[in-house]
Amino acid sequence: MTASLKAIDGAADPGAELAAMMTALGAQARAAARVLAIAPTAQKNEALAAMERAIRAHTPAILQANAEDVAEARAGGATDAFIDRLTLTEARVAVMADGIGVIHDIADPVGQVTERWQRPNGMTIERVRVPLGVIAVIFESRPNVAADAGVLALKSGNAVILRGGSDSFRSCRAIHDCLVEGLREAGLPEAAITRVPVRDRAAVGLLLGGLDGNVDVIVPRGGKSLVARVEAEARVPVFAHLEGINHVYVDRAADLDMAKSIVLNAKMRRPGVCGAAETLLIDRAAASNLAPLVTTLLEAGCEVRGDDAVQRVDPRVKPVAEEDWDTEYEAAIMSVKLVDGVDAALAHIAQHGSHHTEAIVTADQSVASKFLNEVDAAIVLHNASTQFADGGEFGFGAEIGIATGKFHARGPVGAEQLTSFKYRVHGTGQIRP
């Protein structure tokens, strides 16, 4: 235990000590952000390369820390989906390291000139990407978020304060140690990637308050209650990552084999991730597709819930409740419904979707275009699984979250989305008449 944490434990007023510690973290992050904002690309990439090496070299320590977190979660009665999100394996740590390598290789967004034009008076105006400043990332059970958020913030010239959930506390500490090792090796301030070193939930409230103006944006990664609290209490802008109530619509013009493959992957590849599909909508004009699609899910171990028409397909189908259409199961459960074409599918999604990810399976390009244009979601797919809702799959290397709002960033939030812009105006002595 560090001296500062011992002081909090033994303080007459632990709340005041925690507030002082968090305020200091914010001030240190702000100072680091000023350094990162002007850090050369080569120096940031040197840190990223060192971080990748450290993650690979310290994989055994990361896995040991994670095993302790998982054991504690199991003892506490955590669900299988929760355990899946919490668990790291050698392969998952390797993917984490690979993602850092991808972020190393992508273009540095800072300083990019996105537009340039000349005014009639001879002035030249440029719009240039700049960092946001200090980002606070509050997340729950996914320890890989610590790495993703840390390296994306670094690449985009931002400092970041990581507040992982108590369930992944040890895992995040081990990963954070590797990130700090990389910063140190490249000569960048260690406060560029800061981890809240206590489990006290009061730290979240202090982050939401902005730490005396030292936090510029907050990214919540977690369940509905966490996101709701952040949106209700935050005094700084929020990139909201809401639940993934995602749908797959199988149109009358869909190839059945393709539909079976996509639906199975969308639900069962990893049922607990935010890109998993929760509802299957099938065009009533191709009701013959219902039985094979339902059977495919059932035989893969997925619980299927449906109305009377769906239940008649197989006695294993369970009745669907109205609230099921609004539920992110995070488990091997899928609601199934027959709808009267693409318009009815769009209406159902408009009523029950969470603006996260939606997919259509069809060979009819006009129907696909209608769906892609009209559905209100951050990510819309044609003939592909919803599980591609991932920054790594988009070529971003990783993501800090999937923003489901419509301001500033939407969809996978990568390095480019963690920048704002400024206008640079070049004159030759012009004055305004």
Curated annotation (Swiss-Prot):
Location, primary (coarse class): cytoplasm
Enzyme nomenclature, EC number: 1.2.1.41
The catalytic activity, as recorded, is: L-glutamate 5-semialdehyde + phosphate + NADP(+) = L-glutamyl 5-phosphate + NADPH + H(+)
Q: List the disulfide bonds.
A: none
Q: Which family does it belong to?
A: Belongs to the gamma-glutamyl phosphate reductase family.
PANTHER family, alphabetically?
A: DELTA-1-PYRROLINE-5-CARBOXYLATE SYNTHASE (PTHR11063:SF8), GLUTAMATE SEMIALDEHYDE DEHYDROGENASE (PTHR11063)
- What biological function has been recorded for the protein in this entry? Catalyzes the NADPH-dependent reduction of L-glutamate 5-phosphate into L-glutamate 5-semialdehyde and phosphate. The product spontaneously undergoes cyclization to form 1-pyrroline-5-carboxylate.
Query: Which protein is depicted?
Result: Gamma-glutamyl phosphate reductase
Organism from which the protein derives? Rhodopseudomonas palustris (strain BisB18)
Name of encoding gene: proA
